[in-house]
């Protein structure tokens, strides 16, 4: 402690007065108590406790000694705003002061810490918050100052925050006791404006102040402050009353003009806004100040008030701490405060210059009940977390003391002094009670009468039995027209209505202004980086889809493809990134909305994971290969996968009737027999080979002619068609084809003719196959190999039907149309292979070579423009209609891979929709009984069974009987369906 004495000369008092005059500009101290406290801190041989009212000069008690000391003084203050006010004030006095808080920039923080590490720091006073004092980042700096003996004082401002019995308890203040113990050689100074005896003892204990403590305490009585209480329930116009109070306190009533300023405290932000509007409308310029405003707006409002551009500021309790404004003429509380100490501290911000000032509290029992409820709720919440404590009652007791201050008769100054343990002061008419006790008593009695909760019954309030609070005075026919007896009878109600209307308009305009400021911000598009792997990364065709989201989806696809390669152990050396980029770009081009884009990416990822789970490599042929294949034909978007309605038309023609552009034309007997011979001699090409035709095959074979390879859910390697789940394009086209098929369903006579055509004796291909050895026919075979061009655009010139020889006419027995029979359809795979069967010998040849030597026949360019015509009443065209129906029914890819018999195509009269409805009704009881392991298996089996029923129907049985028969056969000896493999061996009904 002696080190502090060596700092000062032999006459420290003279040095103190010199600094007071030179730095702070005062000739003398404000009070003798302030001088005594300052000298005690300068001596430094005791810890000091200072309790002075707001504006009494507490800050000078430690600021002046800090300038005289050798080292640095650390000041702990609860609010950054309070710290900033103190720093700004000292900077104007050219004092080296700094603040270490979270709002400093990195450069400012670096410069401050560097100064503190110097041998002789230039900073004399360092302000910090209690959170900063306890932080680990500040400990090295603190230890450095302590080890070099550069810490002169530890000052704790607003020390009442240490006590749990105080009105503003902060848990972080409790950690300052440990900090004080580490700084044993440095004196500690604790300062507060409000301290009851209980709070004072808590401060001594929590901060570990060394006894004996030098206590300097000023009585809380301030003679220049006039306290009064107004009851809102008794005031007809509270806003007008507040306006009159403001003008009177500011001096306008004496025709001196407005002098000074005032503060009005409200409990909520909404009340601040509303009250500021009401005062402004009534002629008192006022602005709101609360935490809901932006920092720049709060600063502007505070500066306007400090410069007295705005005389009245309407604020929450956060305003005023550390504000050095001496000429505050009044402080009004629009709502009751939460404690007596809080009210005293806030009201004490008036009259710091010693001139008469006014403090008014607008009391309402409604406000009292609301605040009491909130306080008790906070206490209950704390008790749930940490249990009951004796200090929990302190908050409620502090609020009850303020309620007693308002509702009981007595001197206001005496009530405040009693609460803080001071001697009763000599008020000398310094409050409303001492000035006019009779008026205060009458107001309290009126408050008791007006309080509705205190009444036990409803009765007339006047002696004549008329109660103005009740309808028509409480009696029928009494006082009905009494209001018209006076000349100004109705003007009061009209005035109140106008005032209410004006208030509502102001409130409405304010709410509209608040909503206008909350318009949604427009999201700015962030351009991609230079190394962005995405295609069309800078495209903004999909709104609200960011480049970051696309890159995330690309990573998902790349990870899924990588896991697929690892699970299948394939030796594919292709770049996974390139594949993922192609998949992502394809999804991006197909989607129009961000949500649909993300859903499509997730679906692709799920498909890849499903393929990995089944042990099969994910094939991108359905997307990437089709794109490369579509680059060659001249019309890539024209019926890539033609539906049945376009492949088979009911338009009657002699030969090849109804084939659309791009489908397989009529084959002559020569071509048919040659292709049959080639099929019998040549080995069957391997399915799923690596080589693939560069273009799609005929629309018929792409839909039905190709035999699906075994695999999960009937997937075809290299293709995009799935068993029971066609692509969306195919679904759309099938639906359009199905509608035209339903309209063109064959009649009963045509169905009988189609049934007769199934007989082997009626098959015209039977006669063609016996003429294989004809050398003339063999010579024309090479030209017939390419007779089936791709459906994607290799079109031959218009052809004319070729005349048959007499032998061919006689074999048929009718006008010939052999290409539409089932045998001819079964011959087509050899001349027009599906896309997954790649053989070099059957590549399509140009149309001019294919049709060499044949007479052209008429064929329309656009099949969609052909009108649907009714078939001729002949046998063969009816067979064509039946073939068309069978292809449409089997369009989902459910043909049996090994079936080559004449019963391959579906029977007439059974649509897929009818079969599906019957199957679902029959299968539902089994699903409810738990016969299926999952709902997906139930749906898959129903789909499979529906296709079986459309393919075959036994004579004499209905679809329902066939479905029930197949279901009984399936569950015979099987308790439950566990996987899709269970129904792979299930065959359709037999004739």
From Swiss-Prot:
Q: What is the effect of changing residue 597 to A?
A: Reduces interaction with POLR2A
Q: Could you name the domain of life of the organism this protein comes from? A: Eukaryota
- A GO biological process this protein is involved in? negative regulation of transcription elongation by RNA polymerase II
What's the EC number here? Answer: 5.6.2.4
Q: Where is this motif: DEAH box?
A: 157-160
Annotated region Plays an important role in affinity and substrate choice in DNA binding: the residues are: 438-609
Q: Which SMART domains match?
A: DEXDc, HELICc
Q: Which reaction does it catalyse?
A: Couples ATP hydrolysis with the unwinding of duplex DNA by translocating in the 3'-5' direction; ATP + H2O = ADP + phosphate + H(+)
Q: What's the reported outcome of changing residue 727 to A?
A: Loss of phosphorylation in early mitosis
Q: Which Pfam families match?
A: DEAD (PF00270), Helicase_C (PF00271), RecQ5 (PF06959), RecQ_Zn_bind (PF16124), SRI (PF08236)
Recorded GO CC terms: chromosome; cytoplasm; cytosol; nucleoplasm; nucleus; replication fork; transcription preinitiation complex
Modification comment: Phosphorylated by CDK1 at Ser-727; this phosphorylation is required for RECQL5-mediated disruption of RAD51 filaments on stalled replication forks.
Q: Known CDD domains for this protein?
A: DEXHc_RecQ5 (cd18014), SF2_C_RecQ (cd18794)
Effect of substituting residue 504 to A: Abolishes interaction with POLR2A
Q: Function of this protein?
A: DNA helicase that plays an important role in DNA replication, transcription and repair. Probably unwinds DNA in a 3'-5' direction. Binds to the RNA polymerase II subunit POLR2A during transcription elongation and suppresses transcription-associated genomic instability. Also associates with POLR1A and enforces the stability of ribosomal DNA arrays. Plays an important role in mitotic chromosome separation after cross-over events and cell cycle progress.
Return the protein name: ATP-dependent DNA helicase Q5
What organism, scientifically named, is this protein from?
Homo sapiens
Lineage of origin: Eukaryota, Metazoa, Chordata, Craniata, Vertebrata
